[in-house]
Amino acid sequence: MIQFDYMILGILFALIAGYCRALFECIILFDSLYEKHGYSEWWSYSRFTQNKIGYWENTFPNDGGHRIKIVEFIFDALACVCLSYSYDEILHSFMATMMSVMITYFFIKSFGFEQTFKELR
């Protein structure tokens, strides 16, 4: 029997994990742009945190995004537990990881960062 409350909770945790992953990728992107092109008002880390995620600057300082990565893993684990408990099958827990990857790709694609990632590689 499917328990929809745990399934919805698992999907919510996967969405939060995907958002944390997108923040991590943005921090890596801005650090890489700074190393390659130097300081610019368009891609500085301080401008990014001031305009987009001011709360995160106080909670997660510029440490390369490692603390955001830890938060992402916590929400991925919660999503896996909720999704596996919702249907009593361990295979459904992989949905959380796949959804996290898809949501990350959506955020990166919607912000138009994929071309910049190709240039940095």
Q: What positions do the PLM features span?
A:
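Catalytic phosphate/metal-binding cores of nucleic-acid and nucleotide-processing enzymes, i.e., regions
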Residues: 2-121
